Amino acid sequence: MAKASARVIITMACTDCKNRNYSTYKNKKNDSGRLELRKFCPTCGHHTLHRETR
């Protein structure tokens, strides 16, 4: 039988306006902490830090 996937779907929220703009995959084995990426926020209109939400 196949193993359960280590990848989970997460949502990314803008740290400035708190909108949840992006969803992506994350490997829980390799990235145990919260994921942080600088991405474009359409609400703010510029690139901001997006953090993984629970």
From Swiss-Prot:
Keyword Ribosomal protein assigned: yes
GO MF entry, a single one: structural constituent of ribosome
Species the sequence originates in: Symbiobacterium thermophilum (strain DSM 24528 / JCM 14929 / IAM 14863 / T)
Record has Transcription as a keyword: no
Protein's recorded name: Large ribosomal subunit protein bL33
Gene, per the UniProt record: rpmG
Gene3D superfamilies assigned to the protein according to its UniProt record, in alphabetical order: Ribosomal protein L33 (2.20.28.120)
GO biological process: translation
Lineage, uppermost ranks: Bacteria, Bacillati, Bacillota, Clostridia, Eubacteriales
InterPro entries: Ribosomal_bL33, Ribosomal_bL33_CS, Ribosomal_bL33_sf, Ribosomal_zn-bd
Stored PROSITE patterns: RIBOSOMAL_L33
Stored NCBIfam families: PRK00504.1, PRK00595.1, rpmG_bact
Entry similarity comment: Belongs to the bacterial ribosomal protein bL33 family.
Entry keywords, A to Z: Ribonucleoprotein, Ribosomal protein
GO cellular component, one term: cytoplasm
